């Protein structure tokens, strides 16, 4: 398996990991860690796809939203000397000497991870960040300076590795400080949404999602899946507007699962949440899928997730089932939908977005 450019840069600096108690946050792939089999390391995963690749035994994880409190949740699995934890956050204090963060796309997400890492390593501990040069590693270095003097350790494969020694002590990470709750209204229905950095449409109602909800079919029945649920915007709206429906929510992100549970609780709702890589590992069938699917992986446009989702959706829908989807107009989804569904209609369109309804 070819390592990601970030992991190739870390492999060049493998001696860095010879000493200390290491933790990794959101490694960019599962395979670099194979080179550290003799070391005891903790790996914090906010993304289920890499977690599942690392542990190689868990295809999906399901949660009752009522079981997820403000304290979060975790799914942990030991693989040799490595402890892998799928979780939205950890509140550890002085648990490690070194934390390696893979640079996320959103600046606010990175700021949150930095704060979490600072409490993990404590005063005089080291935080390391690896990321693509095009992904904002230079601005990341500036953000790191609030914790201490930064040092560029290496640069290769169009990536950089930067280290900061934490100068001051930090209390345990508090997720509540990063939660933002807003009230939205669409078609006469208002509801609250809890979101955090790193979750799609943080602090705002995405215009595409709003269009999808405005044009939502009124002939929904039975079980409905909100794929790539983010903060639970779509599912909570549908449950409030059509309380007879049973909703299921899925996302690859632990932060999304966490925020969705908080959103449901804010609106006195409950549902089953699934952490999964696409629809992999999900076995139950539904009558309808409603989604605003992702088209980015990191900083790059990437249709792979949605292509696979569209082809897999057939197996999750009952006969005559429907999928309602919003997407940027420039994306080639009508043709993809037509390959797998009997009928595909464009039900709404703006200068930026299209809403499609596909029926098996």
From Swiss-Prot:
Listed GO CC annotations: cytoplasm
The membrane spanning regions, by residue number, are none
Q: Which reaction does it catalyse?
A: guanosine(1207) in 16S rRNA + S-adenosyl-L-methionine = N(2)-methylguanosine(1207) in 16S rRNA + S-adenosyl-L-homocysteine + H(+)
Presence of keyword S-adenosyl-L-methionine: yes
Record key words, sorted? Cytoplasm, Methyltransferase, rRNA processing, S-adenosyl-L-methionine, Transferase
Q: Which residues form a coiled coil?
A: none
Q: Which GO terms describe its molecular function?
A: 16S rRNA (guanine(1207)-N(2))-methyltransferase activity; nucleic acid binding
Return any one Pfam family short name.
MTS
EC numbers for this chain: 2.1.1.172
Q: Explain the purpose of this protein.
A: Specifically methylates the guanine in position 1207 of 16S rRNA in the 30S particle.
User: Which family does the record assign?
Assistant: Belongs to the methyltransferase superfamily. RsmC family.
Q: What name appears for this protein in its UniProt entry?
A: Ribosomal RNA small subunit methyltransferase C
